[in-house]
């Protein structure tokens, strides 16, 4: 089975990059299932009903979220109405369960979403290590894919090794820069520290460059605006064939 996981889709340029590339990538790599992180889809903060509908129409099967889960009020209705939006399991007030189990040709695949706690400025978060243990104990599945939305690479690597051999993949999201450390861990789990961002190419992790530069050089803090110009598509392809697993980076 081949799974395409698309990195944080950021703003209108991210959505454009998604719509322009997803069909070709699915065809070229014989993709069976598409998962995408959508927490930045609406101007960098959250997701709307309209964007959700567009994502479904373009071929995404499951949407994961992150620290901007509640960035748009539409999320509350979407969580009530839709089953394929997965929000971080270690939110204490998570109205769902932080995972979604789906069936593909008789195979059960469980997608788990977790938030890191290091440098994430949310003291209410539960421990992602303990929460994922609880999910794995309670939910029996043929395959498990974990989206770990976290800032610190050390926390991501630690969770990857902690879950090595127990899940099929631990995929880092949030930092918006694709890392080159994709690998198969010693006990068979596929790992990458960050899948990267699908969005503006020449902004600062999605934001208009001058806004961020002014913050660093002049101390001027302005509202973030999505960068314009060129765009990029980042993701990974997971081959979770039981005989030989692999992870391949995609950058367009």
Language model: regions and residue ranges:
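Acidic, metal/ion-coordinating pockets
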Residues: 1-252
């Amino acid at each position: 089975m081949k799974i395409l996981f698309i990195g944080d889709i950021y703003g209108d340029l991210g959505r454009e990059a998604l719509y322009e590339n997803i069909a070709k990538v699915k065809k070229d790599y014989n993709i069976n299932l598409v998962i995408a992180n959508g927490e930045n889809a609406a101007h960098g903060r959250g997701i709307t009903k309209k964007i959700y509908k567009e994502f479904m129409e373009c071929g995404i099967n499951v949407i994961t979220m992150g620290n901007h889960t509640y960035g748009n009020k539409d999320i509350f209705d979407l969580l009530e109405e839709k089953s394929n939006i997965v929000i971080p399991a270690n939110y204490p007030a998570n109205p769902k369960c932080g995972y979604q189990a789906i069936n593909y040709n008789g195979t059960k695949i469980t997608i788990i979403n977790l938030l890191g706690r290091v440098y994430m400025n949310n003291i209410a978060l539960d421990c992602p290590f303990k929460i994922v243990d609880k999910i794995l104990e309670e939910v029996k599945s043929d395959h498990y894919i974990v989206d770990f939305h976290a800032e610190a690479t050390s926390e991501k690597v630690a969770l990857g090794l902690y879950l090595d051999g127990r899940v099929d993949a631990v995929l880092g999201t949030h930092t918006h820069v694709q890392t080159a450390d994709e690998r198969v861990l010693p006990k068979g789990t596929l790992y990458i520290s960050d899948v990267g961002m699908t969005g503006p190419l020449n902004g600062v992790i999605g934001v208009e460059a001058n806004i961020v530069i002014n913050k660093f050089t002049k101390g001027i803090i302005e509202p973030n605006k999505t960068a314009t110009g060129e765009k990029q598509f980042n993701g990974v392809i997971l081959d979770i064939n039981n005989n030989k697993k692999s992870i391949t980076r995609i950058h367009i």
